[in-house]
Structures are given as C-alpha cells and as structure tokens.
Amino acid sequence: MSLIPYALTRPFLFGMDPESAHDLTMNLMAKGQNTLLQQAWAQPMVSDPVELAGLKFPNRVGMAAGLDKNARCIDALAAMGFGFVEVGTVTPRPQPGNPKPRMFRIPERNALINRLGFNNEGLDAFLSNVKRSQARAQGKPMLLGLNIGKNATTPIEDATSDYLKALDGVYPHADYVTVNISSPNTKNLRALQSDEALDALLGAIAERREQLATQHGKRVPVFVKIAPDLDEEQVGVIAATLQRHGMDGVIATNTTISREAVKGLPYAQETGGLSGAPVLEASNQVIRQLRSALGSRYPIIGVGGILSGEDAVSKIRAGADVVQIYSGLIYRGPALVPETARAIAQLR
C-alpha cells in the first residue's frame, strides 16, 4: 500500500499542464526508485501467474508503453505491482517529438489526448537505462517489454531499416519486443498496417529475429501493436500477416483518432491520439475480432480504456490474455494496479 494516497497528490498534478506533471512525476520516480521514497507509490504484487508466448507472467496486468519512453523508471514501475512493464517507444536516434503543447486532459471523460511523436533520447541512452535496472539485475519477478519505432525523419519507405536497427539493440535486453506501427503521431506510420507494407516489414523482422536468436542463444518473442481505428477486414488481414511471419502476439490497441466520445468538450479537437475511458469499447471490439481471426491460443495483450477492475475483466472476456494500463494510472493512481490484477485473478 502506497504511503501517500493518490487522492492527495492528483489535485496538485492536475493543477499543472499535463506534460509538466508527467515530467515531474517521472523525475521523482527516477530519483526515488530503490530508496525509501519508493514507498510513496509502492503496491503489493498480486500473484496470478500465466504463461504466454513462452513467458511466465507473475500476474496479468502490465504497464503500457509511452509513460516511460526512456526506460528511466523500470524499478519504480515494478514496485507498483505490475506483472510486466513495457518501456519506449524508442527510436534509433534521439528526437524531440512534436511541438508543445502536445498533451491534453479531458477529465469529463477520464481521457487524454497526446501528439508527443515518439520524443525520446535515442537507443543508446535507452539501453544504458535498461542496464541500470536493479530489479532486472536482482531477478525480480517482472517481465520487461521494449517497444521500438521509427524516427520521424526516416522516410516511410525506409522504415524497415529503423525497426531493424532498434531490434538489434534491444533484443539482448528484452523479455519481449513490441513493434509499434500504430501511433497516430508519426506521419504515415499507420500506413505500415496496410497489407503489403506490413507483409514486407514483418518479413524483414522475422528474418532478423532468427539471426539474433542464433547470435544470442535465445528466442525473444515479438509482439505487434495495432490501432483501434480498423474495420473487421483490416483486422483479418493483419491477423493473417502476423501468423504468416511467426509473430508471437499482438497488442490491441493504441490510441484512437476518433473524437465521437468527447465531441464538444474542451481540447476534443486537438490533433493526436485519444486514450482513456472512451477507447475501451473500440479496443475491446478489435480484441474480439482478433480472437475470432487468430483462434483461441494466439497471445493477445489488451490495452485501452481500463480505469477499473471491471474494465480489465471486460478485456479478458473480449479475448485478451493479459492487459496493460496507462491513462487509468493517471486518473486513478497506483492502486489501480492491484485492483485490476485481483479482479482478473478472480476469473479463474
């Protein structure tokens, strides 16, 4: 149980602009991890083990990518009781992302809009931070996913080279790797979800992964993260392509470009990806379609709109094997982690 209830700190954080609040929180967590200060946000680890893609997850609730883009707070996040933590998205070269302001809260709907644009310090800094994790060095029961993307300045036709460079770098340090082709905030990135582009990209990744498995003596699972803004035919094409190239699983979904659920509210028309409560059903629908297309045994990580134990259970019932949270952590705080983990565990 964290020493400082989130209900006390949230008004202070929500009094700041979203990116300043995010940066302050991440800096405090980075400095406070593995010290007594960590008790301010620590939560119990709920035991609900499951095996997926050859990995043993301590429980079925993970931290989604995007919060910790530079892998600075792995140990701090592990202390919140997550069964797995995904950091990134990292690109081969450092990049500043899109101009500010680029994050917006819509508290009336428990939602966020961001157009950050893969702002990160680049692969070298990212890997240095991963290697510094004490939780990893001590073998604590938490899996680590490393999420990779392309640089904004890399032409879309050369995107594969960026993904392969990033894969080469993260492979030895990851429990699993996520290929992010679904952020709406990098120009043309979602075009990689189309049939021919996805086929070419995943073919190259599959080939490189086999080379890396031989080189490093281990086969690291590769997941692909997709958007919620897809029709059933597109989902079917993606599912077939994932299986054809031996991808180990899919993460559904990223943020949405739809604004139906927040129409008329302040900041609703800001460009970027919408996350939080309004994405829940759209994400669940894609999960249901994926489960139908992929069969009962293919690994699906469900993410999007989880703000309660009930929301997490809805993802599992839609067909997800495990889930991730992000916006819910902003609105509900660290106590959401054990709440969702316990709710899912009760399904057994």
Curated annotation (Swiss-Prot):
It comes from the Bacteria. Keywords: Cell membrane, Flavoprotein, FMN, Membrane, Oxidoreductase, Pyrimidine biosynthesis. Its main location: membrane. Substrate binds at residues 69, 114-118, 180, 185, 254-255. Pathway: Pyrimidine metabolism; UMP biosynthesis via de novo pathway; orotate from (S)-dihydroorotate (quinone route): step 1/1. Its cofactor is FMN. Monomer. Belongs to the dihydroorotate dehydrogenase family. Type 2 subfamily. This is Dihydroorotate dehydrogenase (quinone).
